[in-house]
């Protein structure tokens, strides 16, 4: 079945919000062996909505539309649909009853006048129940194309999609094939290098597709396998995933939706290790990432933001003479910070970062973007210099991710011994 999606709203085409609905729909369909072939986004304009429906209708068996079903003057979807399909707009009693019932649930007192725009539905349509919001959706058939219309509110749309739209399509798309997919999350390699390493995995007619998506500072590698049976798709995916993991090695830090902090945390918990942090240029970003993971209290002891030189000395025991002699941004100071936080916290691992995030403060010897990362463990202390050159925010993000990756890689190597 050829399925297209249409997102409606001025807020989308003006960049005020990101269209998450389209991604939600596409992912949900993939999970059921169906795919989106085209996607359009238009503003709150009746002519544009009508043109988009006509355009997609010529090449689609089904169109899933979100947005424009609200009560305000710029919600124009139902009017556009009525005009585009030659239907009349009428008060749908079922939609009206639902509207009043939901308004009462939301605390609107009896007797308060409620605009009934959301109960105006084109004739010859079937309602799509909305268990969590005021606006019912609806679907219809026009020129051989199923058309589904749902609110743009993501929480409402998602429920309606899974409870009504996908079951309807799945029942009618009898020719759909089994699709299985897997995301491999990669850090520490550029997109061209990842592409080079994965060359040859996808062969003509093998039933596999590969996609790379840069989501700074990581790269998501998506493997999608398609076959006549679930078992066939899973076998194709398994072989491809094994090959990709072997080629990318430890640069694959997780699969699916696990982030780098979660990957490091999983290893810390599994190995019974504890962690303490001393941060300068990142200002607590590493600790924020660590503590965003549920259960981090099982391994994270403390984090200290020692931004100034005095704080480095008082809190971490870094000698003032060392700072004066080598500079706050130096391998020697980074190592002293890592050892200091490990000793004061009594942790298994002590990680420290110090650097120049800019835009000022750089020198010829130590330009903006110079960062030192140090990891103190029972095995000793490892310190390295990095030069990240993408601006203040990106320097801090890259430092944070590199530090987390250091923790992850150390624990991987430790478990392999």
From Swiss-Prot:
Entry-linked InterPro entries: CinA (IPR050101), CinA-like_C (IPR036653), CinA_C (IPR008136), CinA_KH (IPR041424), Competence-induced_CinA (IPR008135), MoaB/Mog-like_dom_sf (IPR036425), MoaB/Mog_dom (IPR001453)
Cysteine pairs bridged by disulfides in the record: none
Pfam families: CinA, CinA_KH, MoCF_biosynth
Gene3D superfamilies given in the database record: 3.30.70.2860, CinA-like, MoaB/Mog-like domain
PANTHER family documented for this protein: NICOTINAMIDE-NUCLEOTIDE AMIDOHYDROLASE PNCC, NMN AMIDOHYDROLASE-LIKE PROTEIN YFAY
Family affiliation: Belongs to the CinA family.
Protein name: CinA-like protein
Species for this entry: Pelobacter propionicus (strain DSM 2379 / NBRC 103807 / OttBd1)
Top-level taxonomy: Bacteria, Pseudomonadati, Thermodesulfobacteriota, Desulfuromonadia, Desulfuromonadales
């Amino acid at each position: 079945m050829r399925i297209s999606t249409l997102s409606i709203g001025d807020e989308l085409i003006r960049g005020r919000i990101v269209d998450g609905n389209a991604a939600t729909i596409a992912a949900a369909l993939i999970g059921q062996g169906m795919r989106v072939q085209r996607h359009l986004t238009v503003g709150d304009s009746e002519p544009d909505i009508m043109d988009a429906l006509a355009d997609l209708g010529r090449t689609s068996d089904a169109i899933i539309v979100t947005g424009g079903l609200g009560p305000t003057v710029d919600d124009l979807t139902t009017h556009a649909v009525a005009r585009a399909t030659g239907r009349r707009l009428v008060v749908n009693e079922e939609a009206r009853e639902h509207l009043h019932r939901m308004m009462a649930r939301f605390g609107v007192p009896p007797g308060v006048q409620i605009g009934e725009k959301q109960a105006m539905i084109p004739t010859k349509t079937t309602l799509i129940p909305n268990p969590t919001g005021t606006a019912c959706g609806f679907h219809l058939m026009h020129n051989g194309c199923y058309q589904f219309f749902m609110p743009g509110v993501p929480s409402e749309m998602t429920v309606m999609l899974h409870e009504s739209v996908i079951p309807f399509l799945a029942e009618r798309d009898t020719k759909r094939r089994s699709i299985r997919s897997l995301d491999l999350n990669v850090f520490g390699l550029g997109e061209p290098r990842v592409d080079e390493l994965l060359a040859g995995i996808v062969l003509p007619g093998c039933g596999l597709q590969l996609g790379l998506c840069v989501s700074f500072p990581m790269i998501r590698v998506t493997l999608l396998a398609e076959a006549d049976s679930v078992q066939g798709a899973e076998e194709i995916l398994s072989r491809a995933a094994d090959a990709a993991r072997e080629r990318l090695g430890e640069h694959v830090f997780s699969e699916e939706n696990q982030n780098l902090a979660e990957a490091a945390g999983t290893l810390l918990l599994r190995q019974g290790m504890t962690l303490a942090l001393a941060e300068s240029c990142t200002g607590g970003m590493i600790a924020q990432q660590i503590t965003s993971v549920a259960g981090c209290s099982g391994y994270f002891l403390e984090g200290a933001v020692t931004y100034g030189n005095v704080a480095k000395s008082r809190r971490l025991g870094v000698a003032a003479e060392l700072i004066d002699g080598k500079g706050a941004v130096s391998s020697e100071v980074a190592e002293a910070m890592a050892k200091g936080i490990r000793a004061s916290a009594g942790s298994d691992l002590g990680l420290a970062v110090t650097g120049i995030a800019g835009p000022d403060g750089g020198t010829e010897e130590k330009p903006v973007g110079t960062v030192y990362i140090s990891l103190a463990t029972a095995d000793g202390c490892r310190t390295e210099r990095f030069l990240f050159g993408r601006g203040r925010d990106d320097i801090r993000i890259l430092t944070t991710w590199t530090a987390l990756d250091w923790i992850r890689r150390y624990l991987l190597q430790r478990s392999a011994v």
